[in-house]
Structures are given as structure tokens and as C-alpha cells.
Amino acid sequence: MNINMLMQQAQRMQKDMESNIKKAKEELAQTEVHAEAGGGLVKVTMTGRYIVKRIEINPELLQDEPDMIEDLIAAAVNDAVRQAEVVSEEKMQKANSGMGLPPGLAGMF
């Protein structure tokens, strides 16, 4: 195999990877994760791109202390972020499959 063929193959692989990453990012923007805290008193919906779409607070909770509400919102958002990270890593790993990238590196692109 000569150098020109290797360069062409590398360019094709790069274009494929860029296309796969773009597609994965588009899918992540459409993917939603749902998290909750306090046994469902606070619910958060977030995209795979970490955009909070909705926060639901059970009306019963509004009668409690503001500190408790704030803590539950933070817990639900943090749970949603963890879920979004997992979904993101899976989609990016899939987008980069065949590229020989080690696990964890795919999410950097």
C-alpha cells in the first residue's frame, strides 16, 4: 500500500468520524433523560446535550422549607446530568466505533 492510498484512507476515516459525531450530537439533542429526587417530589427532564427542558415540583413540596426544595432540585438535576453523561458516552462511543479510540476518549469529540 503506498502513501497516497494511506492518506486517502485516513481522509475517508476522518470524514466518516466527523459525520458520525455530528449525527450522534444531533441524536443527543433529541434524546431526553428523566430524573427525580425526594421520591418523585421533584422531576427533571434534560436532553443528552445537558439542556434542562423541564422541572416539575409536586405542589405538596411547596409547603416545605425552601432549603429542602433547593436541595431536591439540585439532586434531581445532578441525577439527570449523570444519566445524560452515560447516554452521551454511549452514543459517542458508537459514533467512533471502528476508529480504534479507547473508551472515554470518544466523548471528547
From Swiss-Prot:
Record-linked InterPro entries = YbaB-like_sf, YbaB/EbfC
The record's principal subcellular location, in a coarse class, is cytoplasm
Q: Name one GO cellular component term.
A: cytosol
Q: Name one GO molecular function term.
A: DNA binding
- Where found in the cell? Cytoplasm, Nucleoid
Key word Cytoplasm present: yes
Which Pfam families does this entry report, sorted A to Z? YbaB_DNA_bd
NCBIfam families, alphabetically? DNA_YbaB_EbfC
Q: Which family does it belong to?
A: Belongs to the YbaB/EbfC family.
Record protein name field: Nucleoid-associated protein A1S_1684
